[in-house]
């Protein structure tokens, strides 16, 4: 205040005012400030000052031949004076106006293609809707966000190669375009840009925008997908927010969203299979998202989410070094700890073996709706500062931090037994047992935690066990803050290892991720996800399992047929029949399997009773571990459409319907494909199955009489030879074996021998 009074005094004296307004600016320090260095110190002033001059622009000399000296109003467009220090002409801003109105027209066809990202942005904004402005405190946290909607996901190096190939195809330099996306984009762009007159440098810049993901570390309070980030300056300020719905979606956001859904589905499914890691890899390699291989997307896409990171770890890719617990991403910011096993007793006197973090550590915790700073010592929470969108989100963060602290009062707050299991019915590890327990009900935990008096600190407030805010008291060590905690900014990636149960560890052996951390949230993917793996058939429900199982048998009938006769056990154990078992009532699965296997064995033994349709229809039932019983069935039940439906052992039913005339199979009215051979030929294509017990000697030999049908063969005595007519109308010479022991190998060699005999 004193200073201001003093200045007012000075200004009231006329002499002061005169000095300040009239003195020339020729002070050395000032001249130095504004003239040293290439950097313009006051760009807007410079611009205004330049534009006030008559000829502020310089142009190439050739312009004088293309633009008249004066315009229609008689104003001079360019000066005869040369620009000092260059051989360019000085030009008036009016010349630009003249050029825009009267200059040569060029084709504009390439502009929307080159400036695609800009044109699309305009469309999105045109169709977007801006809602009301709300004034409220904004809890922004810095997150790494994608600022460039509509891009492909190439690495900088891959993009550079594509750009060089498109813009400067004849330049020398090693360019290897390897990935599918690189080749597709290059081909597409070369076609689009034929005869393009836009400067190559501009084209290169714009291509880079289209091909590479650009991320920035920005304070965000709302949506983080790129179509929200491009309007960040319009939707949130320090104390206000404006509602906004984007007027269009972009593929990169859709890819990110669909990738997360696919990864979650795959991790959840793999976790319950016999070999989770192998299953996970098989599914990642056979899945496509929006027509692109999932593994290609995983290699290029930087999305960090628990399930996505587990898939990346399985593929041997690097992932972020932060770890996940209770849906929060933890990043240690200081301190260190060693791990040791310790046995603890819950409030229910159940013994738990936990891995204790021994030492002082500080962490940031970042979740979807809440963030926190946690300081802890060995089995003790020292301080937790939480901020979140609402009471519920804040409570979630507090529970996770309390469990993570491993404090005794938390373990003693357990009421009842801990016996939570994962999807595969295996017990969860103790830390996740505790977490699940308190996520269900945290009342006792909060009540037993203890409360303390608090000092008033700017921006901080206390929180009571019932989650109400307070300025006097708070749960011990816990405070709520108005300010969010920034996400971990470094994009550093580390080498990790993964075990067969999908637990991901860093090189020190700390567990970063496990299937328990994968969110159960279900969403609808924006892009089509095609899971080719049989493990994912059940994702669309029982009907899909039924149709897919039979489609698989029909598609692979040639190999299935041979295995059916030669190595049935191997066939029954195929993973493609696994999903089907969930449709068969549990109590009767074993009996069905025993019945079908016996039936199949009779088919193999009694010649000529082979029936393709029946084998296809009953095969999936034979996959369950068989129970021996004398039960016979005329129909088998499957649980689809919410009730049991019957498949007839002999004949068609709504579930399984084979049309002999069209050779088409329909399952529950859905087309399941065409059989390439006619099941009525009884013998067609399965000589290997039927000729067990016979040795194929070669081509037809007339000395052994006319050709018999396969059914007549059973009358031969051991060692007797005969010509036999096989499925395709060919005749071969066979001999009935003297010993039964070698019957199994017959069917394996039969197929080969028949081919040789015929050819």
From Swiss-Prot:
Q: What Gene3D superfamilies does the database record attribute to this sequence?
A: Polymerase Basic Protein 2, C-terminal domain
Q: Which gene encodes it?
A: PB2
Localization per record: Virion; Host nucleus; Host mitochondrion
Concerning Pfam families, the annotation shows: Flu_PB2_1st, Flu_PB2_2nd, Flu_PB2_3rd, Flu_PB2_4th, Flu_PB2_5th, Flu_PB2_6th, Flu_PB2_7th
Asked whether the keyword Transmembrane helix is assigned, the reply is: no
Q: Which family does it belong to?
A: Belongs to the influenza viruses PB2 family.
- Per the record, the domain of life is Viruses
Site features described as Mammalian adaptation, chain residue numbers: 627
Annotated keywords:
Cap snatching, Eukaryotic host gene expression shutoff by virus, Eukaryotic host transcription shutoff by virus, Host gene expression shutoff by virus, Host mitochondrion, Host nucleus, Host-virus interaction, Inhibition of host innate immune response by virus, Inhibition of host MAVS by virus, Inhibition of host RLR pathway by virus, Inhibition of host RNA polymerase II by virus, mRNA capping, mRNA processing, Viral immunoevasion, Viral transcription, Virion
The free-text function statement in the UniProt record for this protein reads: Plays an essential role in transcription initiation and cap-stealing mechanism, in which cellular capped pre-mRNAs are used to generate primers for viral transcription. Recognizes and binds the 7-methylguanosine-containing cap of the target pre-RNA which is subsequently cleaved after 10-13 nucleotides by the viral protein PA. Plays a role in the initiation of the viral genome replication and modulates the activity of the ribonucleoprotein (RNP) complex.
Q: InterPro entries, per this entry?
A: Flu_PB2_2nd, Flu_PB2_6th, Flu_PB2_C, Flu_PB2_CAP-bd, Flu_PB2_middle, Flu_PB2_N, INV_PB2, PB2_helical
| Coiled coil, from the record | none
GO terms classed as biological process? 7-methylguanosine mRNA capping; cap snatching; DNA-templated transcription; symbiont-mediated suppression of host cytoplasmic pattern recognition receptor signaling pathway via inhibition of MAVS activity; symbiont-mediated suppression of host gene expression; symbiont-mediated suppression of host mRNA transcription via inhibition of RNA polymerase II activity; viral RNA genome replication
Q: How does it assemble?
A: Influenza RNA polymerase is composed of three subunits: PB1, PB2 and PA. Interacts (via N-terminus) with PB1 (via C-terminus). Interacts with nucleoprotein NP (via N-terminus). Interacts (via N-terminus) with host MAVS (via N-terminus); this interaction inhibits host innate immune response.
Which named protein is this?
Polymerase basic protein 2
Cell membrane as a keyword of this entry, yes or no, is no
Q: Which GO terms describe its cellular component?
A: host cell mitochondrion; host cell nucleus; virion component
